[in-house]
From Swiss-Prot:
<dbReference type="InterPro" id="IPR001789">
    <property type="entry name" value="Sig_transdc_resp-reg_receiver"/>
</dbReference>
<feature type="domain" description="Response regulatory">
    <location>
        <begin position="8"/>
        <end position="123"/>
    </location>
</feature>
<dbReference type="GO" id="GO:0000156">
    <property type="term" value="F:phosphorelay response regulator activity"/>
</dbReference>
<dbReference type="GO" id="GO:0005737">
    <property type="term" value="C:cytoplasm"/>
</dbReference>
<feature type="active site">
    <location>
        <position position="286"/>
    </location>
</feature>
<dbReference type="InterPro" id="IPR000673">
    <property type="entry name" value="Sig_transdc_resp-reg_Me-estase"/>
</dbReference>
<dbReference type="InterPro" id="IPR035909">
    <property type="entry name" value="CheB_C"/>
</dbReference>
<feature type="modified residue" description="4-aspartylphosphate">
    <location>
        <position position="59"/>
    </location>
</feature>
<feature type="domain" description="CheB-type methylesterase">
    <location>
        <begin position="151"/>
        <end position="344"/>
    </location>
</feature>
<feature type="active site">
    <location>
        <position position="163"/>
    </location>
</feature>
<dbReference type="GO" id="GO:0050568">
    <property type="term" value="F:protein-glutamine glutaminase activity"/>
</dbReference>
<keyword id="KW-0378">Hydrolase</keyword>
<protein>
    <recommendedName>
        <fullName>Protein-glutamate methylesterase/protein-glutamine glutaminase 1</fullName>
        <ecNumber>3.1.1.61</ecNumber>
        <ecNumber>3.5.1.44</ecNumber>
    </recommendedName>
</protein>
<dbReference type="GO" id="GO:0008984">
    <property type="term" value="F:protein-glutamate methylesterase activity"/>
</dbReference>
<dbReference type="InterPro" id="IPR008248">
    <property type="entry name" value="CheB-like"/>
</dbReference>
<dbReference type="Pfam" id="PF01339">
    <property type="entry name" value="CheB_methylest"/>
</dbReference>
<comment type="function">
    <text>Involved in chemotaxis. Part of a chemotaxis signal transduction system that modulates chemotaxis in response to various stimuli. Catalyzes the demethylation of specific methylglutamate residues introduced into the chemoreceptors (methyl-accepting chemotaxis proteins or MCP) by CheR. Also mediates the irreversible deamidation of specific glutamine residues to glutamic acid.</text>
</comment>
């Protein structure tokens, strides 16, 4: 357990090299201390119980006790925030881990250049600092009935922005939206390239909507969910009387790609008073400027409530702008959107 503001971390990884590398990164700052390391889930679970660390970093592919089983047992016996360290080759595995209660994940760089490893160090420390303040727990989401896509314009186009804690939150929102007439949902989730495709594929298999990673030129369709591609933006544009999606590359000054602000601003410009943006859990302030733009255009912005957010950074910053019309618990966002879609039919 931490003392005097120092965050205690347990590193679990079956690779001795990875354990050393992560430990060095974590202890490069004075407010973080690695209390111990473990080579597998069984050893890790015992050390969590004994040492009570503030945060755990976890490799999912381990001998004896794998990552999924470790998470299930941990959340039952000693709930602790977990950051999954994932390779690109196992990118689809992280979403199951998030459902089982993991706080967030970090993608190992495909090419461990100095710049890539420094970016990993910065991201790791940022997420460890955020994780110590959350209340971990098992998140279960049951599949819903699949909404039917129909031709024509959707009665409602919803832009959803999320970061840390977002994948399970997005899934929860979609489960409340299997309604007629079917809306269209545009999701901007901070996530690396390739992981967004895996995220879309997983939601498509288990959720109530047809879900794809957005491609440049996609027409906005009712009953469809589009996930912004990692490493690019997703914006709404007009194509004659229809709406289309564009996926421009980021500029050198962009902090996030995809960026919630960029999506919300495009919604405000194209849809005006019909624009609707929802800011879900996440670190930072992405979405706040976009919320202002939607509000100025006469549209609506909703934000996830603090008590249901894994991290209240993004919703809190959006609320602070004065542009948010409704602050809603996560479980009520989907039904509220469904009710709005019915009114707009």
């Amino acid at each position: 357990m931490s003392s005097k503001g120092v965050i205690s971390v347990l590193v679990i990884d079956d690779s001795a090299h990875n354990r050393r590398t992560l430990s060095t990164m974590l202890e490069s700052e004075p407010d973080v201390r690695v209390v111990d390391r473990a080579a597998d889930g069984e050893e890790g679970l015992k050390k969590v119980v004994d040492l009570k660390p503030d945060v755990v970093t976890l490799d999912l592919e381990m001998p004896k006790l794998g990552g999924y089983t470790f998470l299930r047992l941990l959340m039952r016996t000693a709930p602790t925030p977990v950051i999954v360290i994932s390779s690109y080759s196992h990118r689809s595995d992280v979403f199951k881990a998030l459902e089982l209660g993991a706080f967030d994940f970090i993608a190992k760089p495909q090419h461990p250049t100095f710049e890539a490893m420094e970016a990993l160090r910065v991201e790791l420390l940022e997420k460890v600092r955020a994780a110590r303040h959350v209340r971990p727990g098992y998140r279960h989401a049951a599949p819903g009935a699949r909404a039917m896509a129909v031709a024509g314009e959707p009665p409602l186009v919803v832009a959803v922005g999320a970061s840390t804690g977002g994948p399970p939150a997005v899934q929860r929102v979609l489960e409340g939206l299997a309604v007629e007439p079917t809306p269209c949902v545009l999701v901007c989730q901070h996530m690396p390239p390739q992981f967004t495709r895996a995220f879309a594929d997983r939601l498509d298999r288990i959720g109530p909507f047809s879900v794809t990673e957005a491609r440049d030129g996609d027409l906005v369709q009712p009953g469809h969910v589009y996930i912004a591609p990692g490493g690019r933006h997703m914006v709404v544009a007009e194509r004659g009387s229809r709406l289309e999606l564009q996926t421009p590359p980021p500029t050198p000054v962009d902090k996030y790609a995809p960026c919630v602000d960029r999506l919300f601003v495009s919604m405000a410009q194209v849809l005006g008073a019909k624009a609707l943006g929802v800011v879900l859990t996440g670190m930072g302030a992405d979405g706040a400027e976009g919320a202002r733009a939607v509000h100025r255009a006469g549209g609506e912005v909703w934000a996830q409530s603090e008590e249901t957010s894994v991290v209240f950074g993004m919703p809190g910053e959006a609320i602070a702008t004065g542009a948010v019309k409704r602050v809603i618990p996560l479980g009520d966002i989907g039904p509220a959107l469904a009710a709005l879609a019915r009114r707009r039919r």
